[in-house]
Every structure is written in C-alpha cells, then in structure tokens.
Amino acid sequence: MRLLPEWLLLLFGPWLLRKVISGQIVESGRPQYLDLRPAMAGGGARGQQLPVPASSEGLNPVRSWSWAWPANHTGALARPGAAGGPPVPRTKRKPSIKAARAKKIFGWGDFYFRVHTLKFSLLVTGKIVDHVNGTFSVYFRHNSSSLGNLSVSIVPPSKRVEFGGVWLPGPAPHPLQSTLALEGVLPGLGPPLGMAGQGLGGNLGGALAGPLGGALGVPGAKESRAFNCHVEYEKTNRARKHRPCLYDPSQVCFTEHTQSQAAWLCAKPFKVICIFVSFLSFDYKLVQKVCPDYNFQSEHPYFG
C-alpha cells in the first residue's frame, strides 16, 4: 500500500503534465515575446514582455491560435454578391433584332463604276441604307470631267441594258448637263418626286423635260407603280479647270468638272432594285445596270 502514491504518480503524471501545459497555453491565449536586446538607459529590464505585434493589415492584433478547424465559409463565398464573395457576373445582353437589322446594307463604294481615259474621267458611287421601319434610302455621288450627259436612276430588274431607246425624244440634250434621276412614273402621270431639279435644270421624273432633254426609258405601268420614292436631297456643283490641250500642248483647253449628290427615300415592298447608269458624250457611250443583292450584307463592293 505504500507504493500506491508512486504508482499513481507514474500513471497520472503524464496526464497531469499535459493538463498543466495546456492550461498555460489556454491561459496565455497568445504567444509571448521576450526582448533579448540589452537594457537601454532608463528602459525596462531584460526579459521584458513585448507588446503583441499587429497584423499585416495594421488594424487588429493577431488572432489567438486555435487548433480547431476554421469555420466553413465556402458556402458564403460561393454565393455571388455575398460579403467577401466574387462579384456578380454580368450577363451578356443579346442585341435586339431591331438594333441588329438597323445596320446599313451597303456603304460608299459598295457599288460603283469608274472610267478613266486621257480625255475624261468618270466616277459614280452609291449606297443603300435600310431604316428598318419599312423604308430605305439610296444615295449617289458622281464626279466627271467630260462634256457629256450622265443619268443615274432606280429601275426594276426587268430594265434592258441597251443603247437603243435610252434617250427619249425631246429637246436637244445639253452636252454639259448631268442628272441623277428616278425612273418609275409614266410621262402622263406627272412628276412623282414633288420637286424640280433646280440645280440640274429640269424636272426629275416622267420624261425629264427641260434643258436636260435626255432621260432613261420609262418602264411599264405595273412596274412604274411599284416604286414609291421621293427626293430628299440633291446638289450639283460644276467647275472649269484649264489644262494644256492634248492635240496642241501650246494651247490651253478647259475641262468641265461636275459633282452631283442625290438622296432618295423609298418605301417597300419590293425585293430587288437596280441602279441604271448611262453616260453619253461626243466620243464615249456607257450603259450599265447594277442590281445589288438586297438581302446580303457584304463588306466587298460591287464593281462595275
């Protein structure tokens, strides 16, 4: 029985030691730091306890050490928009059908033709813009340096491309005039465009009577009523430029430079329209029809 305390000490000694050590750790609550530097004059003694260092953020002291597993915050972090969680991802908005269809069908130079010789140069460019609301606009630009008559018009696909019958009978055409005309009304129906081409010197529409004289052939009655267009804007500028004559460089000749712009607003419904261009000068004839694909948006131009 005298050996009982020794046996109890051997049995419960390690357990008591662990309890004492754990009690010290719990009592301290955080690690202690000792100042091993030499004591300074008027300072504290060696072995003085230093203050607890602050955290890296400089706000709060370092939290007490714990062997317990940290709380599971993955659920809170996984929720978009939660505190400390990832930002809410933005959903990509699909462009509306109206905004997507508002893109222009053609651009400047998407259909054009160019003629360049020693005697003259001719360039016609155009574009078609769909306004989605059932209307579309047709725009033209024209530059020429020749004494001749140019006509650009909207025609149905059935329009024949030929030299014969292009110029209607009427007053003698002025060689220096050019026009951007709309073809789509019979002569007896009157001008459909509602305005006179003051800068062009004649009425647009019908037979284009006036100083211009010449015009394109007029389609049939059914085709003529299929077009519903009117002129929104038109302008023509002319200038003379002097240059040495080709036949005699010692003499000075002049060339007539013409710049024309026109915009037509047309209403549907019709699926295909064509652009008819005719140019007539003293020594050159040109007739061309371009029918852009209205339902195909292409980045490549239509060359004439």
UniProtKB/Swiss-Prot annotation:
Role description: May be signaling molecules that resemble neuropeptides and that act by binding to alpha-neurexins and possibly other receptors.
| Originating organism | Rattus norvegicus
Location(s) in or outside the cell: Secreted
* Pfam families cross-referenced by the UniProt entry: Neurexophilin
Q: What is this protein called?
A: Neurexophilin-4
Q: What keyword terms does UniProt attach to this protein?
A: Glycoprotein, Secreted, Signal
Any one GO MF term held by the record is:
signaling receptor binding
- What Gene Ontology cellular component terms go with this record? extracellular region; GABA-ergic synapse; synapse
